Amino acid sequence: MSMALLPRRVKYRKSQRGSRKGNATRGTELAFGSFGMQALERAWITNTQIEAARVAIMRNVKRKGRLWIRIFPDKSVTARPPETRMGKGKGQPAFWVAVVLPGRILFELDGLPEQVAKESMRLAAAKLPIHTRFITRERLVKV
C-alpha cells in the first residue's frame, strides 16, 4: 500500500523557490507519540523520500505501534524536459517537497519499546538527506 503524498488541489500549481532561513517555530514538539525524529538541518524533503522512510519504519516495527508523519509535501518543484533550450517559460511540476527547517519533528512513534523505536528511526533517517536525532517525551530539547 503506497501512499502518494501530494496535495489533492492547489490554488497555484507552480510555486517559487523561496528561502529557507531560521529554525522551525511550529511542529517542534511531540504532539502524538512518545518517540520522534527531529530534523537538525534545513532541506526540501521529497514525497518519495518521506515514503521510503515510512516503509523503513513500518518494516521494522511489523504492525506494532502507531506512526504519525508530521510533514507534508505541499510545495511543487518544476523541471524542464531534457535537451530543452533555455527560456520559453517555467517548466511543469515534476515532484512535491516538504520544506523542513531545523527543529521540525518529522515522524512520531508510539506503542513500542524505546530500543525498537530508536532502531526504526535510525533506519528511516538513512533514507533522508538531512541529519536527524531521536527524541523522547522525557528528553525533549530545543534546537
UniProtKB/Swiss-Prot annotation:
Listed InterPro entries: Ribosomal_uL16, Ribosomal_uL16_bact-type, Ribosomal_uL16_CS, Ribosomal_uL16_dom, Ribosomal_uL16_sf
Role of this protein: Binds 23S rRNA and is also seen to make contacts with the A and possibly P site tRNAs.
Residue ranges, compositional bias (Basic residues): 8-20
Gene Ontology molecular functions: rRNA binding; structural constituent of ribosome; tRNA binding
UniProt entry tagged with the keyword tRNA-binding: yes
Stretches for region Disordered: 1-26
GO-annotated biological processes: translation
Protein name per the record: Large ribosomal subunit protein uL16
TM helices/strands, residue ranges: none
NCBIfam families referenced in this protein's UniProt entry, alphabetically: rplP_bact
